[in-house]
């Protein structure tokens, strides 16, 4: 009988180059059409090369994206989402995303089925540009840092934009909005509305931009120019006067050698 090999045979080495296991929520999101977990739980191409395509598959399959009260969501994700333009997406809810600073939904054909957008309570949100043929409801309430909102959504019929104390500029184009409440937006200086069906509006008094007052004294440049002109005229006059002076002396000693 042959002796047994010591060690029970060779153990297989662990393959360090194997793809990490997939999160079960990825496939569930594809099947349900809803993503509700943080951005950091999505597949990431930096973790595994093929996960970039997997990430795109998850996002483009979504009908609803709800990522609330997180600091991990930044402008890069918002731009990625708009660029992918998921064909069945109807709801984007990014409420409470404290590190979201700019949101640009453009051009008009982006996210062709999107109807609802919630960007409320985003502490760092500063600028919003929305262009959409399909969006009907937008929530921008309680954004303390937002300064400018440009909204061109012909079918918009609900806009919540109260309690935005830093908002300076609002430009709004919509055919269906009937009510507009800007209570708590007390820093407004520019409000341009193209809303033919607007019936009721609450708009605080606009702040008048400071006008530049012309100084009562002449500008320094004009004074310098005037001084230079006067000096030039004086120099020319002196030159003419010197040229007109004639030496009337009868001395035969040349003028240059005359003693002082």
UniProtKB/Swiss-Prot annotation:
Signal peptide: none
Keywords, in A-Z order: Cell projection, Cilium, Cytoplasm, Cytoskeleton, Flagellum
Gene Ontology CC terms: axoneme; motile cilium
SUPFAM superfamilies, A to Z: RNI-like
Quaternary state and interactors: Component of the nexin-dynein regulatory complex (N-DRC).
Protein task: Component of the nexin-dynein regulatory complex (N-DRC), a key regulator of ciliary/flagellar motility which maintains the alignment and integrity of the distal axoneme and regulates microtubule sliding in motile axonemes.
Name of the protein this chain belongs to: Dynein regulatory complex subunit 6
Gene behind the chain: DRC6
């Amino acid at each position: 009988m042959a002796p047994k090999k010591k060690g029970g045979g060779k153990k297989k080495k662990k393959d360090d180059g194997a793809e990490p296991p997939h999160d079960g929520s990825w496939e569930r999101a594809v099947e349900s059409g809803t993503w509700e977990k943080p951005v950091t739980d999505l597949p990431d191409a930096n973790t595994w090369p093929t996960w970039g395509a997997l990430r795109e598959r998850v996002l483009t399959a979504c009908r609803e994206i709800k990522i609330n009260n997180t600091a991990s969501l930044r402008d890069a994700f918002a731009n990625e989402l708009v660029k992918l333009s998921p064909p069945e997406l109807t709801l984007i809810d990014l409420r409470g995303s404290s590190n979201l600073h700019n949101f640009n939904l453009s051009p008009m054909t982006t996210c062709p089925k999107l109807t609802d957008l919630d960007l409320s309570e985003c502490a760092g949100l500063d600028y919003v540009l929305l262009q959409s043929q399909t969006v009907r409801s937008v929530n921008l309430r309680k954004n303390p840092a937002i300064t400018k909102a440009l909204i061109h959504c012909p079918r918009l019929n609900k806009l919540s934009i109260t309690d935005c104390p830093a908002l300076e500029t609002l430009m709004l184009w919509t055919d269906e909005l009937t009510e507009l409440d800007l209570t708590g937006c007390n820093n407004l200086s520019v409000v341009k509305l193209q809303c033919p069906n607007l019936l009721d509006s609450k708009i605080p008094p606009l702040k008048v931009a400071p006008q530049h007052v012309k100084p009562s004294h002449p500008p320094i440049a004009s004074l310098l120019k005037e001084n230079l002109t006067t000096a030039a005229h004086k120099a020319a006059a002196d030159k003419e006067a010197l040229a007109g002076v004639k030496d009337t002396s009868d001395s035969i000693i040349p003028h240059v050698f005359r003693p002082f």
